[in-house]
Design a protein with these regions (language model features):
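Structural motif
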Residues: 13-17, 57-63, 106-108, 153-156
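Repeated scaffold domains used in trafficking and secretory/extracellular systems
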Residues: 35-41, 85-89
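Loop-centered beta-sheet repeat module
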Residues: 141-158
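Conserved beta-strand positions in repeat-built beta-propeller and related beta-rich domains
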Residues: 7-11, 49-56, 99-103, 138, ...
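Short loop/turn segments immediately following beta-strands, especially the blade-tip
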Residues: 19-24, 65-72, 111-113, 158
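Residue-level detector of Asp-centered blade-edge/turn motifs that repeat once per structural unit
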Residues: 1, 42-45, 92-94, 139-140
């Protein structure tokens, strides 16, 4: 059995590593340098990555890559701002890519839409503001679910 794996490294001089796992052996196939990749997902023959702090206003970026047959990554366009600070999680849902912006407490859609959470949680020292940290489809793929540590809440989007 052969599996293709992508790992991101946010360290200095980091980037995205492509490995092949075959017969229990892991082999590096390619390396794509990029600025502080935080989280990656693959959707069909595309790879999406959150870039930690790639704009002058310190917002995170969302970069799309085409995965070539060799596993090499080819960038598609330039990074797009997630309109938030410290994006930390991605998911694909109904043809769009969504990013959770941790410090901004918001959800960004690749269509350009932004939903900002408001309020605070019951623990003022830890929950002074929204901290959106996860986004994923519901198990039946009818809804988009988002968790927010700062509000101690789960949001459901349809």
């Amino acid at each position: 059995m052969t599996a293709s794996l992508f790992f991101s490294s946010c360290a200095e001089d980091g980037g995205i590593y492509h490995y092949i796992l075959q017969n229990g052996k892991l082999t590096l196939r390619s390396f794509t340098p990029c600025d502080r990749p935080m989280y990656t997902i693959t959707e069909k023959k595309q790879l999406w990555v959150i870039l930690r702090d790639c704009f002058d206003d310190h917002t995170s970026g969302l970069q799309e890559y085409k995965i070539l047959d060799s596993g090499t990554l080819m960038p598609i366009g330039e990074p797009v701002s997630t309109k938030g600070i410290v994006a930390c999680h991605l998911c694909g849902f109904h043809g769009k890519i969504y990013a959770a912006n941790y410090l901004s407490g918001s959800i960004f859609s690749s269509s350009g839409a932004l939903d900002v959470h408001n309020g605070h949680g019951v623990h003022p020292s830890r929950q002074e503001a929204p901290h959106t940290h996860f986004i994923a489809p519901s198990p039946d793929r009818k809804f988009l679910l988002s968790t927010d540590l700062g509000l101690d809440s789960i949001f459901v989007y349809d």
